[in-house]
Amino acid sequence: MSRISNIYFYYMLVRTIIQVKGRKNMEKKRILITAGPTNEYIDEVMKITNMSTGRLGIELTKHFLEEGANVTLIATRSVFRSGLYEKYGLSNNPNLKGVPIETTEDMYNALESESRESYNMVIHSSAVGDYKPEFSFRMEDLATELAQAVHDGKTTREEILSILTNPNCKVNDDTKISSYEPNLAVKLTLTTKLIAHLRTWYKDAILIGFKLLENVPKEHLMEVARKLCIKNNMDYIIANDLHDLRQGQHLSFLVNEDGYQNVEFHSPDDIYETAKSLVLNIN
């Protein structure tokens, strides 16, 4: 055997040993991943959602399963029914626990419930909606209610605001709202910030979150991600810009409490390799 052949042989041998050892170590790891959007319902049919498909979460789930890890995936039902999920055959993997949800409240309950288990890493890639419908109303009805209040002498800011935030003219949303309401309005309210609870629930896990802004300077994106990391006691935030995504550039950056870590990602594979390195370095 030539010297070059010898070198190549030993290189491949060492590489194989490292891969086998890495897989054995990964088989001991438990990973929790959230993916896709959340759905907030206006009535029994209409909903508020976002553009997230859950692809990143599915890709990460696939990679971790291939390495032998045990994965819990919390995602909307649309993610579990997606072509990519079926393409990878994830539904038949015994190491995958799928937890279907719809709303932010559902995901909150699922995350809280799963915290009774021990996880090495939590990757919170779900695009959780910031707002949810509180109630719907017809603008004509609200105008009538406000006019009556003014007639009754209720003209202070606090009195008007009280009617606006809790009117008597709410539309019943227990069934489908009529399709012929020309002036239907929906009052939104904030959803629970799930990222704020992760460290309380998963004290010993590596926590990775995400931050998406649109068309901002890179320095601003990094600073917002850094502050998010500190505020919620996360280990890392992966930051990206919607402008880049729309241009077909899947560019994102790794940030921790100290700021940008000089690590760029250009694909889900890149994110997985970093996550893998992090989780294999813990005992």
Protein language model annotation of sequence segments:
Residues 2-5:
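Serine residues within intrinsically disordered or low-complexity segments
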Residues 7-25:
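Short, Lys/Arg-enriched N-terminal segments with co-localized hydrophobic residues
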